[in-house]
């Protein structure tokens, strides 16, 4: 892993709200207000990250809106619509040994306990009971699978996660 990690995307700026530069916020954090625990934000404009600070935020019905420092008009806010919100990777808190950020699991090779390479984690789906790894099978998968969905349940299906090697060991039948 390089010493300079990519910023971690936490949300997206939505449409403008009102005439004073407020924006609706789409957040990917566990709790809606969790995105405001991070400062400063990075927003991506024309392929470049730039630092911004939240001046104020509030709940607006079921939505959450924010005003960024230096953004005072509706036109300025509209220019930022759909920009990604991120933070430097260094701002992310360290997790306990048995917990992982999704971004660290995506791209990991998935090997079952019999040594069969099941493919690569493409995305993770949140269900009500547990997260599920969406594993894209290798092009020449011996079982004719294009993808597999493996529940991320430690000690039952997930035997070991080795982030340094980018590998996840699973107890999962490749024919599933």
UniProtKB/Swiss-Prot annotation:
Gene Ontology CC terms? cytoplasm; ribosome
Q: Could you tell me the superkingdom of the organism this chain comes from?
A: Bacteria
GO process terms (BP): ribosomal small subunit biogenesis; rRNA processing
InterPro entries for this protein: PRC_barrel-like_sf, PRC_RimM, RimM, RimM_N, RimM_N_sf, Transl_B-barrel_sf
Q: Which residues form the PRC barrel domain?
A: 97-176
* Keyword vocabulary terms for this entry: Chaperone, Cytoplasm, Ribosome biogenesis, rRNA processing
Q: Which Pfam families match?
A: PRC_RimM, RimM
Main localization of the protein described in the UniProt heading = cytoplasm
Instruction: Give GO MF terms, alphabetically.
Output: ribosome binding
Subcellular compartments: Cytoplasm
> Do you know which NCBIfam families this protein is assigned to?
16S_RimM (TIGR02273)
Summarizing the function annotation, the protein's role is: An accessory protein needed during the final step in the assembly of 30S ribosomal subunit, possibly for assembly of the head region. Essential for efficient processing of 16S rRNA. May be needed both before and after RbfA during the maturation of 16S rRNA. It has affinity for free ribosomal 30S subunits but not for 70S ribosomes.
Q: How does it assemble?
A: Binds ribosomal protein uS19.
Domain description: The PRC barrel domain binds ribosomal protein uS19.
**Family classification:** Belongs to the RimM family.
Q: What protein am I looking at?
A: Ribosome maturation factor RimM
Origin organism of this chain? Shewanella halifaxensis (strain HAW-EB4)
- Organism lineage string: Bacteria, Pseudomonadati, Pseudomonadota, Gammaproteobacteria, Alteromonadales
């Amino acid at each position: 892993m390089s010493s300079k990690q990519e910023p971690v995307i936490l949300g997206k700026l939505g449409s403008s709200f009102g005439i004073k530069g407020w924006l609706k916020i789409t957040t990917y954090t566990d709790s809606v207000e969790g995105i405001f625990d991070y400062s400063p934000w990075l927003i991506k404009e024309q392929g470049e990250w730039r630092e911004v600070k939240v001046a104020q935020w509030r709940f607006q019905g079921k939505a959450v809106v924010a005003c960024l420092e230096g953004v005072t008009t509706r036109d300025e806010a509209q220019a930022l619509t759909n920009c990604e919100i991120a933070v430097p990777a260094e701002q992310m808190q360290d997790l306990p040994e048995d917990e992982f950020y999704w971004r660290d699991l995506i791209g990991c090779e998935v090997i079952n306990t019999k040594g069969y390479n099941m493919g690569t984690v493409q995305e993770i789906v949140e269900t009500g009971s547990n997260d599920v790894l969406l594993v894209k099978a290798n092009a020449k998968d011996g079982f004719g699978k294009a993808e597999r969905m493996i529940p991320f349940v430690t000690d039952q299906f997930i035997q070991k996660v080795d982030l340094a090697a980018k590998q996840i060991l699973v107890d999962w039948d490749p024919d599933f």
